[in-house]
Amino acid sequence: LRAEMKSIFTKMELSRVAFPVVFLITQVTLLQADPLTERSNGSPPSVSAPEPELEWIRPGKDGNRFVRQESGAEFVVWGVNYDHDRSGRLIEDYWNEEWSTVVEDFKEMKSLGANVVRVHLQTARFIKTSHEANGSALRQLARLLKLAEKTGLYLDITGLGCYHKQDVPEWYDAMDETDRWDVQALFWSSVAETCAQSPAVFCYDLMNEPILPGARKKETDWLAGDFAGSHFVQRITLDLAGRPRKHVAKAWVDKLVSAIRGHDDRHMITVGVIPWAHHFFPKANQPIFYSKETDENLDFTSVHFYPKKGEVNKALAALAIYDVGKPLVIEEMFPLKCSVQELGSFIDGSRKIADGWISFYWGQTIEELAAEDLNLPGAITKNWLEYFRVKAPEILGTGNKSNQ
C-alpha cells in the first residue's frame, strides 16, 4: 500500500482484524462565501439563524427513533463519511485554500441522496495551546455549518482526531490523563459554542473509536498504532489503575458532555465505537460505551460495521447487541469484506432496529469513476455509490422501524 493512502479500509483491516495484506490490497479503494469574523472578545464565532428547510433533529419521545423537532416527522440517516478527499487529504488540509472543492463535494454528496455528512476534526488543528482554541479553525467550521445549511445537509461532527501523528503537538502527547481530558474538554467547549445555534449539526461524536487498555497493562502511547501513516484509534487512558473500564469510560464521556452542554443543550451526542461484540461474536460481552453503567448522557448509539462475506446473519446478530433502547446508527459501513449485494442485505436486515447508515464519499463522482479505466477497488467504489444513490429514495421515503 502506498504510504500516502489514508482510507478507512487500511484502518479497519490492520487495526481490528489483521487480515493478510494481500486481501487488503484487493479491497482498498485508491484515493485518488466569506470567512466569518471572530467576536471582538476573542470567543468562537456563533452561527446565525438557520435556513427554514432544516429542522432540529432529536430522539423521539419513545427514545427509539429520530424525529424532526418542529414537524414530529421521523428522520432516518442516510449519510457518508467525508473523512478525506480523493488524494487522501484531511478536510483541514484544503478547506482554506480550496473552499470551492468542499462546496462541490457537498453538492455531490447531496446529489447521491445523502442527508448527513460525517466530518472528522483534528485536535491539533482546533487547539493552539492547552488553554487556547484556534479561532481560525473555528471560523472555518462556522463557514462549513453555513454551507451545510445552504446545501440542506446535516453534519455528524466527529472530534479529537489525531489521525496524523506528526501533527500532534509534543505537549499534548506528553500529558497525563487529567490534563489531556482537560484539553479535550476545551476542544468540545469551543466547538459547541461555535455550533450551538445551527440545526445543521446532527450530532457531536466525541471521538472516533476510543479504546481502553487492558486491566493489568499500562500503555505508553495514546494512539493505538500506525496504519499506513494514519492513527484512527485512540486510547482515553494509558492506565486503568485498578478502575473498572466502564467507570473510566463514563467519567470521560461525562466530562466531555459537560463541556458541550455548557454551551449547547440541544444537539445530540454520541460515540462511534468499534463493535467488539461483532469481532468476538458469539462470545460477546456487553458494550463498554453503550451499557447502562456508561451511556446515560449519550443520546444514541453509533457503531461501525463491515460485514464479512457469507456472514451477514452473524453481523445482524451482533448488531442486535447494540439495540439498547436508544436510536441506533451504523456510522461506518462499506463493502470492504463482502459484496455490494451482501452489504445491501445487511442494510435491509438491520432496518428493524437501525435508524441510520453512514458510508463513505471521497470527492469522486460516479460519472468521474465511470470515465476512468477502473481497477477492482475503483469498480467496487463505483458500484457501491450507484447502489447508495438508488437506495436513497427507499430509505428516506419510507422510514424504517415503523414500516417494517
Question: Language-model segments: what does each one mean?
Answer:
Residues 31-33:
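Boundary at the C-terminal end of the N-terminal hydrophobic targeting segment
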Residues 53-300, 310, 333, 337-346, ...:
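Active-site mouth of glycoside hydrolases
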Residues 364-404:
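Aromatic- and carboxylate-lined catalytic core of secreted/periplasmic carbohydrate-active enzymes
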Residues 36-60:
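N-terminal low-complexity, Pro/Thr/Ser-rich intrinsically disordered segments
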Residues 6-19:
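Bacterial N-terminal signal peptides that target proteins for export
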